[in-house]
């Protein structure tokens, strides 16, 4: 599962922004209301940021058609300061900024909730308008409007699916921002990209991979004994608890590598069922197959199987033990009523991949060495000025601070050249 990654500490963010909020005029809320498509402006408790409703077409090819309100979060500093454009891939509930906020000193933070997530869901809901292009058009409308107020440098950034959002935006609107920093964002080239399974067969060392597989087989062999120990509510599993359990076992290695689990924590296959259950619960991959989990990520799964791409499971070693789920497919996680109608569009990511390799300027790609999603990291061929940093030993938490000093120097010198300003080294 492509996880939600949040950028920045909310406590530190509120303190920092409260201290500099006076740098903008008291009538900012009124100015925001004059921007095109801004429908509501609500100041958050404490007054450090604004929750903004921005009207968007559901289908940007029909701008006069159905509309919906997209939620934005603005933490302002000054009109001439840089703007960090946080491109969320999921829901959002506050301004972000992450490590870039510290590097840029006192930037404005503008975070955009992705369409079809959180409070930014059209009604009535038609899934066919949840496309990469429509989401990029959303970003373009927002940037165009807010540039009427904010004249400094603009930097788009996001992590995981949010990093994908930043990259897709770059491909369709290359001149809207001055730089793009994408964290741990895969660029898949198929509905079920085979490179991900190959990565899972080679990541780490053989001993660790063997231990993970033995653990999975033990979980399946003792399924009937372990499920009662999980204390799950069957009412939350419409697909059936046993089927969800087996999905969670198949998903386990992806969660293991994505979140940097230590192999020494894995029980031996002959451990007690209580020990096996405890470790399985710790990674919690079964949640994604519960009704709340499916609902939370259904929009992502729709995107995955129509445009963004995902992965399948190599079940060769597990097939004898899959009693409730003999033919697993993650399309089971797509929105109700869409599974049999989904058609994958290979042209979208083919365009994105080609554009990023041959045309995209001022882009930083950051990946973690052992992150499962590094399997489909962007491959650069030297045709643009883009740089890529793969952080040794890092997983889905990879960032510049964890990179080597040489990699940090490359990042800072490159960004300073692109932005024409000095960055604070954190």
Where are the regions that the model predicts?
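Bacterial Sec-dependent N-terminal signal peptides
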Residues: 1-26, 200-211, 426
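Conserved alpha/beta-hydrolase
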Residues: 104-122
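C-terminal subdomain of alpha/beta-hydrolase-fold enzymes, centered on the catalytic histidine
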Residues: 258-426
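Gly/Ala-rich beta-loop-alpha elbow adjacent to hydrolase catalytic centers
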Residues: 158-162, 166, 170
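Catalytic-loop region of hydrolases
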Residues: 23-108, 413, 417-426
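Alpha/beta-hydrolase fold nucleophile elbow
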Residues: 150-160
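Alpha/beta-hydrolase active-site loop
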Residues: 129-148
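Alpha/beta-hydrolase
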Residues: 168-302
